[in-house]
Structure formats: C-alpha cells, structure tokens
Amino acid sequence: MISEINGNQILGLETFPSFLKTKYKTNISLDSKNNNVFFITSSGELYSINYYSNNINWLSNIFPRNSSGSELFYSSPIVNRNDKIYFSSSVSTYSINTNNGSINWELPFSTNLRPIVTDQFVFLASEEGFIINIDNATGKVIWSKSLYKEKSKPKRNKVGDIISILLVSDQILATTTKGYFLFIDYKTGKLLNYTKASKSGFYSSPVIVDQKIYTIDNKLRILIFN
C-alpha cells in the first residue's frame, strides 16, 4: 500500500509467487465501510486485509489443491455487495462471506468478465455468448442462454466475443469486441435486439450516468447513447 500524501510505501505483502506469464491482472476491491481491501493473486489466493491496522483478516486459496501448478489461473473483477464478494475464476464462480472468507455458494462456471450483482440475482456471461442468471441467496441457476447457438440469433463471427455486461433498467446490455450492443431481457435471457454501436470497437466498458450510456471506443473517442 502507498501513501497518497507522499507516495511512500505503507505496507508490503509477499504472496505466493506465480511462474506463469499471464495477461490477467490481480483484481482488487475496496470496502471503505469496514476499511478492508480484497484481492486475488494469479496463484489463486484470496486476501482480505484491513488497510488501517495493516492486518490480514483472512486468507483463502481457491485454486484446486490437486492442481499440477501448470494451469493458468485467472479471475473476473471482484464485486463487493452487502458483506459478500462475488467473482468468477478459471475454477468456478463464488459468493464469499467478507467477514470470515467462508464460501456461501460455488457454481462451476468460469469467466473473466465482471458479474452483475443485485440483491436478488447474479448475472454471468462468457466471451462465447453464454449468459446465466443465478439466485443470489442460493447460487441456483434460474435460467441460462447461449446467444450464438440459435439459428435466429446473430453469429459470433459477425458481432464478436462478449467483453462486458451491464444492467440497464430491465435489460442486460452486453458489449462485444466488434463494437456491438446486445440487449437481453434480464427475466428470461431472450435477446431483444442488437446494433452496431462503434465501428472501431470498445476501449472501455460502458457506464450509466444520468440515464445515458457512456463508453470509449478504440479511437479513444467518448460515445454517448440515450
């Protein structure tokens, strides 16, 4: 940890080293209410640290114990909500109790895309176009859809891989590598519509501000949609 005042190191933590080169970065989530920070290393170690006391609250290893060590571990960004953290990894998708690190539920579904988390649901998507709606409390699958498998759906080679999902009102907005918006009914997973939003593709994931969608394309232009 680095002081924002003078740039000096406040805390250094040595984690288990990984000898594999990977494009995936360590994911970090801040809990400012309880002064905690959560992060996952590329070796599959999940840490909870209090950044005021500089103490480790708990440590959990979510990489399979029977792994040979040669497999690539990755995780999605961490979502922190109501004393739980949610993330997907190369192993499974998890809901974790932030107080003690215990697993609330685990689902054998892997993705590196950030999940959507509400009080009732957790939505997951893979790059290949597979969408899942999960009950937040139990981890049970409510519905699942494969967007690119049905004949009436857009083809993956046309619209590209999914790179992000966002809940917009009563729809899931998915963005793709080839600059498409996909609009999905959150209740059923049905694809409602899709449109080409950027010719160059997306540089950033979209955000919602004042009922408008903002994103940055690969030419570093800010795009705004109603």
Model-derived regions: residue spans:
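Structural signature of WD-repeat beta-propellers
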Residues: 4, 32, 41-42, 73, ...
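Short loop/turn segments that connect beta-strands within beta-propeller blades
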Residues: 4-8, 50-54, 97-100, 135-138, ...
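Extracytoplasmic beta-rich repeat domains
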Residues: 8-34, 55-82, 90, 102-119, ...
